[in-house]
């Protein structure tokens, strides 16, 4: 198996970050906690949880707690695919949530840069 680049590793959530996010988010989806658009979600959709990127990996979003939150399969899919035209609204909720967790939260610090020191 080929070794991942420094950039690829920086964009993934490591075990420590995943645990920090899990405990910060009380083990549940941040959108479910708000009751956001739950009408089509099945019980299984809500049971399967994963860490979502605020700034996606495809846009060099870092795998750090300040760029992630716990999401159920239903909401994670809705956020990633924007299939209901609510991606912008969800990103605003996500952003406000992260800002409430980190007083010095700065969106510019969530993107991988080879030249940051």
Regions found by a protein language model. Name each.
Residues 1-26, 33-48, 88-117:
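A boundary/linker detector
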Residues 31-70, 84-87:
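Histidine-centered nuclease catalytic patch
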Residues 71-75:
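Zinc-coordinating Cys/His ligand positions in small cysteine/histidine-rich zinc-finger domains
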Residues 76, 84-91:
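Inner-leaflet juxtamembrane helices
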Residues 80:
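Active-site hotspot residues in diverse enzymes, especially metal/ion-binding acidic/histidine motifs
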């Amino acid at each position: 198996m080929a070794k991942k680049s420094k950039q690829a590793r920086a964009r993934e959530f490591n075990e420590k970050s995943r645990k920090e996010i899990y405990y910060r988010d009380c083990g549940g989806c941040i959108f479910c906690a708000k009751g956001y658009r739950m009408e089509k979600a099945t019980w299984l959709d809500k049971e399967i949880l994963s860490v979502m990127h605020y700034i996606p990996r495809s846009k060099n979003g870092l795998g750090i707690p300040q760029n992630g939150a716990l999401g159920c399969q239903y909401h994670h899919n809705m956020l990633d695919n924007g299939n209901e035209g609510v991606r912008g609204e969800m990103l605003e909720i996500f952003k406000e949530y992260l800002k409430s967790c980190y007083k010095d939260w700065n969106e510019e610090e969530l993107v991988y840069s080879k030249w940051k020191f």
